[in-house]
């Protein structure tokens, strides 16, 4: 069994589990598992990098500002614009629509350190020039910042990943899954398919 210590407020609680399904970044997992992995595994984990993402949400009145759900952009501060009401009208407050601007960066770089106001000012210039929205129709804006959003495939990542997985596979009932947990660049449908496959394997093994 796995021993799982965690905090609930000021209280330290210890629990047990027969299986661990990890979706946290692999470097974080390597740092907390016991017994402590070899130094080579720690080094490989340090070599795995993730891209960060800032999602800048801009609320406007309820109008369809694009004839699609999302649009990829080049030479802009953001690389994708999503039209939230095109996904489902209940995802936005009543009477509003929301643009979601996806801004890719590295954790703690200059872009990450930009305030929401700075990101908005850099973006609204292009949104106006591209005739997507106008500044005067913006009701509010805010951001959500995701530190480890995408695996960053640097040269040598396969060798580093193989070193880590070779060690972790020695631990029975420890499963790594998801874009972050398995260091796989997957779309949401692939993540769901991967999870369904995991559940099917567990059922075939008779472990769930």
Where are these regions (language model features)?
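C-terminal catalytic lobe of FAD-dependent flavoproteins
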Residues: 120-208
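Mid-domain catalytic core of redox enzymes
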Residues: 1-117, 122-131, 144, 162-170
């Amino acid at each position: 069994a796995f021993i799982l210590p965690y905090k609930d407020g000021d209280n330290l609680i210890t629990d047990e589990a027969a299986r661990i399904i990890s979706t946290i970044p692999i470097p974080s997992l390597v740092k907390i598992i016991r017994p402590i992995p070899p130094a080579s595994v720690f080094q490989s984990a340090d070599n795995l990098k993730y891209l960060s993402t800032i999602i800048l949400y801009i609320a406007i009145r309820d109008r369809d500002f694009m004839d699609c759900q999302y649009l990829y952009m080049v030479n802009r501060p953001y690389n994708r614009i999503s039209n939230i009401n095109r996904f489902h009208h209940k995802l936005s407050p009543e009477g509003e629509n929301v643009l979601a601007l996806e801004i890719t960066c590295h954790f703690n770089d200059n872009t990450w350190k930009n305030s929401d106001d700075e990101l908005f000012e850099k973006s609204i210039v292009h949104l106006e020039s591209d005739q997507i929205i106008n500044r005067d129709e913006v009701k509010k804006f805010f951001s959500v910042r995701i530190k480890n959003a995408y695996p960053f495939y640097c040269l040598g990542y396969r060798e580093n990943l193989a070193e880590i997985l070779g060690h972790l596979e020695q631990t029975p009932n420890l499963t790594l899954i998801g874009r972050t947990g398995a260091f796989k660049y997957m779309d949401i449908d692939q993540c769901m398919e991967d999870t369904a496959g995991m559940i099917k394997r567990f059922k075939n093994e008779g472990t769930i």
